[in-house]
Amino acid sequence: MSELVEKTSTLLKYLDLDQRGAVIAEYIWVDSAGHLRSKGRTLQRRVESVDELPEWNFDGSSTGQAPGHDSDVYLKPVAFYPDPFRRGDNIIVLAECWNNDGTPNKYNHRHEAAKLFEAHRAADIWFGLEQEYTLFDHNDNVYGWPKGGFPAPQGPYYCGVGAGKVYARDVVEAHYRACLYAGLRISGINAEVMPSQWEFQVGPCTGITMGDELWVGRYLLHRVAEEFGVKVSFHPKPLKGDWNGAGCHTNVSTREMRQPGGMRYIEEAIDKLSKRHKEHIKLYGSDNELRLTGRHETASMATFSSGVANRGASIRIPRSVSKEGFGYFEDRRPASNIDPYLVTGIICETICGAIENADMSKEFERESS
């Protein structure tokens, strides 16, 4: 796919070497720009519980998370997953970032969201996220597009099959298998409306687990793309013009919504969401105004709307849910570059209720403090 690819065939013989009981743990975290960082360390035995994982640290001045004169930021493990690249007993460790004074780093939004989910545990809130993304080559051209030109207009690419309709299916398939190996609740993939735009779905996941699994899924996608020599973009409108943007549609349900008669609770939730539209939009991704225009299967950012089977609405109720009278709803406003902890957290806050020691809007504002 590109001359700038990793020599994975050469690497294979080293991956088969005996590690003599040692385990490699790749710690991953979210930096100040909402990007992923990682570094590896050696552990002396197989890990059975997250409590066995040591805390670690990194240079926060190099990631925009701390000043140079006080640069140590601490990594507190919160979950771990089988590593599909190193395999064996090797693991990927998802970690929260903490300051040396014992407070969560201002880019650590997981900590605040977790408070809400714990407080509303009885609601048994489920999420499913539809992560759209676009693939580029190393020269920042959309992968597979004519150099200096454009492909045919949108139409044949969504869920397309065949050369000229889909690009980089090998990347997508490799990522799918990597997610399954890691134990993520990846529920599907499909080619999207714009050529070289794809989507993977994760969920249903309960509470804070949703954000965890989406971040790990993104990490795996970037790592797979490295090996194929392509770049992954989560920008919500990577190309101007008559091309679809990229979102992260968020499917939501509580226990009450999933039971017979649940439509009543779905409608109540939508009413609550309508009253906090502006607050939600602030947390629904940067540059989202380029995507939420009322065109290309989006609602206008300026207004809130809902409807059955309406992909031009802010909130969509699936036709099957409307017919059966219970199930879930889809919030179509979130952009592809969201922090899932902010989005799932504020949705929980809005439909289940605010709590005294957590506020997702204020949590987001901490970034600029």
Curated annotation (Swiss-Prot):
It catalyses: L-glutamate + NH4(+) + ATP = L-glutamine + ADP + phosphate + H(+). It is found in: Cytoplasm. Transmembrane segments: none annotated. It comes from the Eukaryota. It holds the Pfam family Gln-synt_C. GO terms for molecular function: ATP binding; glutamine synthetase activity. It is an enzyme of class 6 (ligase). Signal peptide: none annotated. Keywords: ATP-binding, Cytoplasm, Ligase, Nucleotide-binding. The keyword Glycoprotein does not apply. Homooctamer. This is Glutamine synthetase. It comes from Eremothecium gossypii (strain ATCC 10895 / CBS 109.51 / FGSC 9923 / NRRL Y-1056) (Yeast). The lineage of its organism: Eukaryota, Fungi, Dikarya, Ascomycota, Saccharomycotina.
